[in-house]
Amino acid sequence: MKISPLGAVIAADILDVDLAKPLDDQTIALIGDAWNDQLVLRFRNQRLNDDDLLRFSRYFGELDPPGPNPYGVTFLPEYPEINVISNVRDDAGVPIGNLGDGEAVWHADMTYIDN
């Protein structure tokens, strides 16, 4: 695995790691350190299914469920921790996701939590 900073201030590319596979403790620690140092990490060319995404996310702590949405549905009932953000509608005109009308402007979630 290679960590390549993208600038002098924040952000790095994480290269040569397959997030679809389980990671060892050393790799998880290196990614965590890079996240603390760089604040924004970019992982290119990843092919993750929902299980892969949840496994990788859980390496860094307990997941908070998405908040309520205006449609009152869980978009992925088998994966309630995943919030689908999409502006796509199905054939009946029902949104397949949340926040599809530009509601997700830049913001920071959970800033009121210590850790």
Q: What name fits each language-model region?
A:
Residues K2-V40, R44-N115:
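Fe(II)/2-oxoglutarate oxygenase catalytic core
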